[in-house]
Amino acid sequence: MYLDPIAELITKINNGRKAHKAEVSFATSKLKTAILELLVKEGYIKSYDIRPTENNKSETVVKLKYKNQTTSSINGFKQISKPGLRIYSTHLNLPKVLNGLGIAIITTSKGVMSDKQARKENVGGEVIAYVW
C-alpha cells in the first residue's frame, strides 16, 4: 500500500510500460480517475475500467497504449508535486514540458487539466506530474 496515491499511479504505469504489459491495476480514487481521464483524452493510454472488489472497494485497470509492439505512447511520466514538497504555479508561470510536446498535469479549482487547458482558462494550481 502506498501512502501517496499519485506515486502509486505513476509507478504502476511506468513499470507496466517498461515491462510491455497490456494493462496494469491499482486501487481507485477520484483524483486518479480524473488523471486517467486526462491521459485518455490526450492519447497517452487506451482506456481504463473501474471494477468492484471485495470489502466495497474498487480497482482501476488501465489499458496501456503502444505505438508498435515495443514503443509505448508514454516516453516519460514524472511526479513533480509530492506530499513533502507541494509545487504550485500561477497561470502565467505554468511549465511547458519539452516545449509543448508533453503535458503537465495540473489540479485547479476547476478540476484536473493539462497545462494548455489551464492557460486557456487562466487558472493556476498544483503541478502534479509531467507526461511526455
Swiss-Prot record:
GO MF term list: rRNA binding; structural constituent of ribosome
Stored InterPro entries: Ribosomal_uS8, Ribosomal_uS8_CS, Ribosomal_uS8_sf
Example of a GO cellular component annotation carried by this entry: ribonucleoprotein complex
Cystine connections: none
PROSITE patterns in the cross-refs: RIBOSOMAL_S8 (PS00053)
Biological role: One of the primary rRNA binding proteins, it binds directly to 16S rRNA central domain where it helps coordinate assembly of the platform of the 30S subunit.
Family designation: Belongs to the universal ribosomal protein uS8 family.
The name this protein goes by in its record: Small ribosomal subunit protein uS8
Species this protein is from: Ureaplasma parvum serovar 3 (strain ATCC 700970)
Source lineage: Bacteria, Bacillati, Mycoplasmatota, Mycoplasmoidales, Mycoplasmoidaceae
